[in-house]
């Protein structure tokens, strides 16, 4: 149906295009831009060479010479230069250039370029000559709005010139204007270039930076002078954290939750923080499930077809957060090994039938996984344990580790402790093992895994240091990254720690004295830190904000967090991802001119994106759910880098791109340092935190679209009515914050310290209430649509209802197809997919993991609002029916009815959420 519709639409478009009048497209063919950088230089006593910068869409150029009355065309050329010969000696000639392109067989010309005037080479020193060089006494000006400055020009040679007249121009008159004498007037914040042009097009330029007059402008300007040295420091620190094997647990570079390497690195970072000059440096202990990988290998002993004894040694092996053979004990020295394909229940059953056995006791299973496109590691791992395998050895078949077939990969396991080893090898090593299995005889495998894991038995350290505030506000701003890693982890996240320390260094070196505390945190246990949950990452940060420093809740103005900040994936735009309510702060900073003297790393600058998709996959989630708004740079279109390098040994300090996926960029690190140092200083310098709750209202409004299909019209109308009133309150709240900040700036400009202090006090009071409201939004409205996407509670259910409804419709239209059968896979945040692949035991465990039924406290607790826990049973039975070859629609009615029952349950829950959210809007309105 959709393909047919697409074809019809495409045909209609093609037909409409072919029937358009001939001139239709010509209307869009506007004239090319006029040539720029036109110059006229004497070549001989009778010739002058003209040159110019071309226009991007021009086909050619026309040269015009002044004949005493008008400009006459003397040459048409495709080149960007022309030499006019046979000229009279010592006579001055004037020229202009036009660009042209051809549209519908006709030439369309640009406007004239500016005029250039020159003489051929002088026949004697007494004759006039051309300017050869223009020199300005200043090549850069830094000004404030309203200020003026003089640019003085000198011309070379010093003798008689055709004319000494100079034409002055500004690249942006809205930033700075220049008069005919070279007097520059700063108009508005920004950057522009002033050009002095001589008669023949020879120029000199001066860059103008008009600074904002905001109170934090001077501090930020000073800071930017120190980013170069701080970047060198950040690069060295990032490299040390990645490649110093004394700070790793094994030869591949692992540094995981509560491990010896984490502890050593915490000591190292605490020392670095002190050397930078941070105050109150501490190592804050947090409880995690310990994981320390030390070593793993496997040896296959077998006989080849000639009966010769052979050995295959697999040394390139790492372990997931699962038990090691050393820790479990027992004999792993002579095990069978079986190729189990993708490790599904059906493949095990087929193996049992073929080999006349009932389980995998005494066997290692070899399983291929694609954790990008297919299924996470928890499914194959749990299924292997259910089938009583001695161990599972996995390898990538797609998605991650795509760099090459000799690349290892590692991810968080998102599973219970199944008391069974689970390791990862390369695809090429898997091919070697398969070859032995297929062609060898008497194959026996010895597996050795030294991997220490345990539940609530580990201690990780978050390393903290601060630049103390001077205003005794009781508030703070956090700047953070994590230092645990897989393999080298150069980008993820060693360079991020380097950047955090670099920001601290550049602030301290520049003499910055914040009003609020600026707290720098190196988190441990971000990659993994908890068994028995699908939300097993960001545990170090969760423990920090909930157990170690719960007092940070309500006093932390923002978290600025970093993940892989130095990867250049060739984007024209950088992205500042933010919690919805603080996106406006990022936009205001970028528009403020505070970074006018910092060249953007990105061609089209940085865009701000309200984000509930990427932030939850980082430490930001722990803080956001506890009332702290978050910022984080994150490039778009980085998927190929992630597929090739993320969580592999290829996450390294590569600066030469051989895969088209991206490189490490020191220049990007320096830009991030300037931008996000400025962000922290900007937030610090504005007494009132300008939270825009109307941005979150946009989220609420989008969430209610389509809800009337499942909730009463009255309840939806009440929701929308309350939302309209909430918008009014949100607008007033933001205006109040802006007024406080405007009062502060006015007092600053007036030099009124008393009024500045009063505005600061008003800001503290405002922030206390605004952060309470922000936390209330997180508590009352926001849930998880799956294990990593934040969504409004009722919308989580609505997403699931839409899927159930789609399944019911497909099963009820009288024509059952395989596509119909697979629609249900997306239910419950894609966890329903397990019903097609795995045993009842695994499906039960996966739903427990999704719903966090066995973990009392982590950021996913009580947040997963979408699931009907047992719908997988219906899906599994439906799929079994299909696999029996049944296509009779009547046979699927029972499943459609069961799905309708789940929908009824979800509708009741959704209705309750719509009601509770409507009530919460009333409360939130009063809080604002």
Walk through the language-model features, giving the residues of each:
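Beta-strand-rich modules
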Residues: 84-105
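Pro/Thr/Ser/Gly-rich low-complexity, intrinsically disordered linker/stalk tracts
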Residues: 27-57, 89, 106-123
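Extracellular/luminal Protease-associated
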Residues: 256-258, 315-421, 606-609
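Soluble metallo-hydrolase cores and metallopeptidase-like ectodomains found primarily
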Residues: 319-351, 411-490, 502-512
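Metal-dependent peptidase/peptidase-like ectodomains
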Residues: 523-643, 724-792
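Noncatalytic luminal/extracellular "stalk/propeptide" segments of secretory-pathway proteins
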Residues: 228, 243-359
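Extracytoplasmic soluble-region selector
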Residues: 125-215
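His/Asp/Glu-rich mid-to-C-terminal helical/loop segments that flank catalytic regions of hydrolases
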Residues: 639-698, 823, 827, 835, ...
């Amino acid at each position: 149906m959709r393909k047919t519709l697409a074809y019809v639409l495409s045909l209609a478009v093609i037909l409409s295009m072919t029937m358009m009048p001939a001139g239709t497209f010509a209307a869009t063919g506007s004239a090319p831009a006029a040539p720029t950088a036109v110059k006229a230089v004497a070549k001989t006593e009778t010739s002058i060479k003209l040159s110019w910068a071309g226009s991007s869409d021009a086909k050619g150029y026309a040269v015009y010479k002044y004949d005493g009355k008008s400009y006459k065309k003397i040459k048409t050329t495709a080149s960007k230069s022309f030499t006019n010969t046979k000229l009279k000696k010592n006579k001055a000639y004037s020229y202009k250039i036009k660009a042209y392109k051809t549209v519908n067989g006709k030439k369309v010309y640009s406007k004239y370029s500016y005029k250039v005037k020159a003489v051929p080479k002088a026949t004697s020193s007494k004759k006039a000559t051309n300017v050869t060089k223009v020199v300005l006494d200043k090549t850069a000006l830094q000004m404030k709005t309203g200020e003026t400055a003089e640019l003085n020009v000198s011309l070379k040679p010093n003798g008689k010139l055709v004319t000494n007249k100079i034409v002055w121009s500004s690249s942006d008159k809205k930033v700075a204007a220049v008069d005919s004498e070279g007097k520059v007037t700063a108009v508005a914040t920004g950057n522009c270039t002033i050009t002095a042009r001589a008669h023949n097009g020879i120029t000199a330029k001066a860059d103008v930076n008009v600074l904002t007059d905001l109170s934090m402008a001077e501090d930020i300007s000073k800071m930017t002078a120190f980013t170069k040295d701080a970047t060198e420091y950040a690069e060295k620190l990032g490299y040390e954290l990645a490649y110093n094997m004394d700070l790793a647990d094994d030869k591949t570079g692992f540094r995981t939750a509560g491990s010896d390497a984490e502890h050593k690195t915490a000591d190292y970072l605490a020392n670095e923080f002190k050397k930078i000059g941070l105050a109150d440096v501490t190592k804050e202990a947090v409880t995690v499930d310990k994981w320390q990988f030390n070593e793993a290998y496997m040896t296959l002993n077998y006989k080849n077809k000639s009966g010769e004894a052979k050995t295959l040694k697999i040394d390139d092996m790492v372990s997931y957060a699962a038990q090691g053979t050393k820790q479990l004990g027992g004999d792993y020295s002579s095990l069978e090994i079986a190729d189990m394909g993708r490790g599904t229940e059906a493949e095990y059953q087929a193996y049992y039938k073929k080999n006349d056995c009932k389980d995998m006791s005494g066997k290692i299973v070899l399983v291929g996984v694609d954790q990008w496109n297919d299924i996470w590691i928890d499914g194959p791992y749990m299924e292997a344990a259910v089938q009583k395998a001695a161990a599972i050895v996995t390898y990538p078949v797609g998605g991650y580790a795509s760099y090459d077939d000799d690349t290892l990969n590692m991810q968080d396991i998102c599973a219970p402790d199944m008391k069974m080893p689970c390791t990862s090898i390369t695809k090429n090593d898997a091919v070697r093992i398969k070859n032995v299995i297929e062609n060898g005889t008497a194959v026996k495998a010895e597996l050795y895994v030294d991997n220490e894991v345990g539940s609530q038995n580990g201690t990780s350290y978050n390393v903290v240091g601060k630049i103390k505030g001077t205003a005794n506000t009781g508030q703070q701003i956090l700047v953070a990254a994590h230092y645990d890693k897989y393999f080298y982890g150069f980008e993820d996240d060693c360079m991020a720690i380097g950047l955090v320390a670099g920001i601290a260094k550049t602030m301290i070196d520049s003499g910055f004295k914040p009003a609020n505390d600026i707290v720098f945190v190196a988190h441990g246990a971000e990659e993994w830190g908890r068994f028995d949950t699908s939300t097993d990452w960001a545990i170090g940060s969760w423990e920090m904000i909930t157990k170690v420093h719960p007092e940070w809740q309500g006093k932390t103005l923002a978290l600025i967090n970093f993940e892989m900040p130095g990867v250049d994936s060739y984007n024209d735009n950088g992205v500042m991802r933010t919690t919805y309510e603080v996106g406006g702060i990022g936009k205001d900073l970028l528009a403020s001119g505070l970074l006018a003297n910092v060249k953007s790393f990105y061609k089209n600058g940085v865009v701000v994106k309200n984000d509930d998709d990427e932030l939850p996959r980082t430490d930001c989630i722990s803080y956001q759910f506890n009332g702290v708004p978050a910022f984080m740079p994150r490039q778009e279109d980085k998927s190929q880098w992630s597929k090739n390098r993320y969580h592999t040994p290829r996450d390294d300090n590569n600066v030469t791109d051989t895969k088209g996926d991206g490189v490490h960029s020191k220049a990007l690190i320096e830009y991030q340092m300037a931008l996000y140092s400025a962000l922290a200083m900007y937030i610090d310098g504005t007494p009132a935190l300008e939270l825009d709750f109307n941005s979150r209202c946009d989220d609420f409004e989008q969430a209610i679209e389509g809800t009337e299909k499942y909730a009463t019209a009255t309840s939806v109308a009440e929701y929308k009515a309350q939302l309209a009133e909430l918008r009014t309150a949100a607008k007033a709240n933001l205006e109040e914050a802006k007024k406080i900040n405007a009062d502060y700036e006015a007092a600053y400009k007036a030099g009124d310290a008393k009024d500045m202090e009063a505005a600061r006090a008003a800001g503290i009071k405002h922030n206390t209430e605004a952060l309470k409201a922000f936390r209330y939004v997180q508590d009352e409205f926001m849930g998880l649509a799956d294990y990593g996407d934040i969504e409004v509670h009722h919308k989580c259910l609505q997403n699931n209802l839409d899927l159930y409804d789609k399944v019911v419709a497909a099963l009820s239209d009288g024509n059952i197809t395989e596509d119909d059968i697979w629609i249900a896979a997306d239910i419950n945040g894609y966890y329903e997919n397990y019903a097609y692949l795995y045993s009842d035991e695994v499906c039960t465990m996966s739903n427990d993991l999704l719903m966090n039924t066995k973990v009392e406290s982590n950021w996913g607790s009580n947040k997963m609002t979408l699931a009907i826990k047992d719908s997988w049973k219906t899906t599994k039975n439906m799929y079994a029916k299909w696999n029996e070859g049944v296509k009779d629609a009547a046979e699927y009615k029972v499943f459609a009815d069961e799905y309708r029952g789940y929908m009824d349950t979800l509708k009741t829950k959704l209705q309750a959420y719509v009601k509770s959210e409507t009530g919460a809007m009333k409360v939130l309105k009063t809080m604002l």
